[in-house]
A protein has these predicted regions:
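Juxtamembrane segments of multi-pass membrane proteins
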Residues: 2-134
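Basic-flanked hydrophobic alpha-helices used for secretion and membrane insertion
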Residues: 68, 86-91, 98-413
């Protein structure tokens, strides 16, 4: 049959040209369609990776309480979670620049950044802005803890109280417990009023088992007494953690076992006193640490209220765990940012983060940063007013802001 077909084609060569050309055209169009489909799918995948920066991206805060700290990292099926804080700042020429502070140590997918955008390995870009590893401040709670319990007491040291230890007309000091999760994000728990009578006041609050929280200090807000300053002693003692609770929020009715939290005597604490009067703030007498137990224990001077002032003076005693000196902040800039701000690598710039001005060094540059550049995210109504983007390490940012009493930063995604 093959020989016969060949003989027929040789007798009439043009009769088979049409079917052959049609077959070739069909194969070519099929290959073109396959190539276009693969190219389109790859393009859509690249755009999706650039827009999300991770396999799953969740935009929106998780709440500011210690009971929700690190909650996404504890969900079933989640291998790793990296918090981020996104904001915008004014750039030169009325432009709007995008700022992304990301926990690069836990962003193990590298923002899904392509090597052609990073100019090499994306990990090299992250390493350029990551801080050096450092021990965590304060005392770290056990991983499976769902509730923290501790005792607070405030005692008048001098002058010694006569009669009733507590003046019923005076409002007691209000204490706030300061915490920090494994990402360096700060949390606050309002413990409430603590009478100045020397008796322990029990404090109990829920924490997230997935947060890796550490107690990093306390704040005592008060009003100085009239006529005469007092020496008072504030101390934290008997810190315990509840484990094995059946309730995800660690409620009182479903508690498990209590365990003491080990506190090393090597933990150091710093304390400062600030007095606010008529809108002005001034430092008070430096508090004095008592003992070496590893828990906050300080004697402080309350200051004195002037009878002639119609506006009450307020005081804040802030006790925080000692930290090593924060490393200088570094940033990765997009080519767009460098071009539109006339900046270059090695320049130092000032940025406003969480209401505080921080100094940042431009350490690396990339063509573009994933998750940045969209008008609805950058805040620039006109694309021409977009001023590029900067990437910072969230841990490095929180280390700098931790030393500023007015700074609070939250994860926005």
């Amino acid at each position: 049959p093959a020989a016969l077909a060949g003989w027929q084609f040789s007798r009439r060569p043009l009769r088979g040209a049409g079917p052959v050309l049609l077959l070739v055209l069909s194969v070519a169009m099929g290959m073109l369609a396959i190539g276009q489909s693969a190219s389109w799918n790859r393009s859509q995948s690249d755009q999706a990776d650039f827009g999300s920066g991770a396999s799953v991206r969740l935009v929106g805060g998780q709440g500011g309480g210690p009971a929700t700290a690190g909650i996404y990292g504890g969900l079933d099926g989640v291998r790793q979670a990296a918090p981020a804080h996104r904001t915008t700042v004014e750039a030169s020429g009325g432009r709007t620049a995008e700022i992304l502070a990301l926990d690069t140590a836990h962003a193990d997918e590298g923002m899904l950044m392509r090597s052609d955008l990073a100019g090499g390995s994306p990990r090299r870009v992250f390493d350029a802005i990551a801080p050096e590893p450092a021990p965590r401040p304060g005392f770290v709670l056990p991983k499976d803890g769902t509730r923290v319990k501790l005792d607070l007491r405030i005692t008048t040291v001098s002058p010694k109280p006569s009669g009733s230890a507590v003046d019923p007309d005076e409002d007691p000091p209000v204490v706030t417990v300061l915490l920090e999760d494994r990402y360096g994000l700060p949390y606050r728990f309002l413990a409430g009023p603590v009478p100045v009578d020397g008796r322990p006041v029990p404090v109990s609050f829920a924490v997230s088992a997935a947060g890796g929280l550490a107690v990093t200090g306390i704040e005592v807000d008060d009003e100085p007494p009239f006529g005469q300053a007092q020496k008072r002693r504030v101390a934290v003692s008997d810190v315990r953690v509840v484990t094995g609770s059946d309730s995800p929020e660690g409620s009182e009715g479903s508690e498990g076992q209590e365990h003491p939290v080990p506190v090393s005597g090597s933990v150091r604490w710093d304390a400062s006193m600030a007095l606010a009067e008529r809108g002005d703030s001034r430092p008070g007498e430096p508090p004095v640490r008592n003992g070496t137990s590893g828990l906050p224990d300080f004697t402080y001077d309350t200051g004195v209220e002037n009878d002639d002032d119609w506006e009450r003076t307020t005081s804040t005693l802030r006790i925080t765990a000692a930290r090593p000196k924060a490393a200088p902040l570094k940033a990765v800039a997009t080519d767009d940012y460098l071009k539109k701000t006339n900046a270059k690598l090695g320049d130092e710039i000032d940025l406003t983060l969480a209401g505080n001005t921080v100094r940042v060094t431009l350490a690396e540059s990339v063509r573009r940063l994933p998750t940045t550049g969209a008008a609805e995210l950058s805040g620039a109504a006109d694309p021409a007013q977009y001023g590029g983007a900067l990437l910072l390490d969230l841990r490095a940012v929180t280390e700098v802001l931790a030393r500023r009493t007015t700074a609070t930063i939250e994860a926005t995604e």
